[in-house]
């Protein structure tokens, strides 16, 4: 039973649950909850791709995880690298086959864009200053566009996708700040490993301010109403301001670790802002 749990842990079950719920919320925003088949297929595709990417990333991150995440299943030896690689391939295949049940545009986004981008990122772009962070953010943003394509409403998901991109980019950057020691030892050329914590904190502050201002733009231009603003301020704007003031005071690795988790929460709440606005109106 323990062995089974370690293999499940490899896939990051909490992340998978979050991605499944995100697809449900996306469907709700597009008034598509009654389209059960499309909803279930989009959930399974996103979960399969997410799980596969998590397993494959752990394979590629083995050396850095020895320092940064010593309790991960591959590092502890509870899951073999060959097995993790096989699981990743299997899940990528299952997700791709399931995508064939959806529209041509959804198939292209999943198989033609998301899948190769995830593999190229893990093999070649991880640790590349800023580009690696941007690619991860693009992959997450594509999940929202994929959902929109599946339901025939890509336009509806463009703004949520942009917000998800911004928050994910910042989270990945802050996570690199938290992992600066392990990344430096492994020779990864991340932005924080290259320029240090102080300069990285300044970049994070500027990014947080830009993302915070950008998130207000849809409300100020009348795309969304007061419900969107209220949820956005509570779950996104306030956490971003916390990052700004904390990093202005004294940037530390422990702070970065904490804020990377806060930003994961903010990404979910940001999506809920669109859901609440749609539901209340």
What are these regions (language model features)?
Residues 29-41, 110, 134-184, 197-210:
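Functional transmembrane core segments of multi-pass inner-membrane proteins
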Residues 44-45, 62-111, 188-224, 265:
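Multi-pass membrane catalytic core of lipid/isoprenoid biosynthesis enzymes
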Residues 63, 116-129, 176, 243-252:
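C-terminal ends of transmembrane helices
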Residues 23-30, 95-103, 118-122, 143-151, ...:
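Structural signal for membrane-spanning alpha-helices in multi-pass inner-membrane proteins
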Residues 2, 218-281:
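Extended hydrophobic alpha-helices typical of membrane-associated regions
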Residues 17-26, 75, 134-151, 192-197, ...:
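Small-residue-rich segments of transmembrane alpha-helices in multi-pass membrane proteins
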């Amino acid at each position: 039973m323990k062995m089974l749990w370690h293999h499940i842990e490899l896939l990051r079950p909490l992340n998978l649950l979050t991605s499944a719920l995100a697809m449900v919320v996306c469907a709700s925003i597009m008034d598509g909850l009654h389209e059960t088949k499309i909803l279930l297929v989009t959930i399974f595709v996103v979960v399969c791709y997410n799980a596969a990417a998590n397993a494959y990333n752990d394979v590629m991150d083995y050396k850095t995880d020895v320092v940064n995440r010593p309790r991960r299943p591959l590092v502890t030896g509870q899951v073999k690298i060959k097995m993790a690689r096989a699981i990743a391939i299997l899940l990528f295949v299952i997700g791709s086959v399931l995508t064939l049940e959806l529209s041509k545009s959804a198939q292209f986004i999943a198989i033609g864009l998301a899948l190769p981008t995830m593999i190229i990122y893990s093999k070649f772009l991880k640790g590349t200053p800023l580009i690696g962070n941007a690619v991860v953010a693009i992959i997450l943003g594509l999940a929202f566009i994929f959902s929109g394509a599946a339901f025939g409403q890509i336009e509806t998901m463009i703004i949520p996708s942009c917000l998800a991109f911004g928050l994910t980019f910042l989270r990945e950057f802050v996570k690199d700040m938290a992992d600066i020691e392990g990344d430096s030892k492994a020779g990864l050329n991340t932005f924080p490993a290259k320029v240090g914590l102080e300069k990285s904190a300044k970049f994070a502050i500027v990014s947080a301010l830009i993302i915070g201002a950008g998130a207000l733009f849809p409300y100020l231009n009348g795309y969304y109403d007061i419900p969107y603003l209220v949820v956005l301020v509570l779950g996104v704007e306030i956490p971003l301001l916390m990052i700004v003031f904390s990093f202005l005071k004294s940037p530390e690795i422990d702070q970065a670790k904490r804020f990377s988790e806060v930003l994961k929460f903010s990404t979910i709440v940001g999506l809920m802002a669109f859901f609440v606005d749609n539901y209340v109106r």
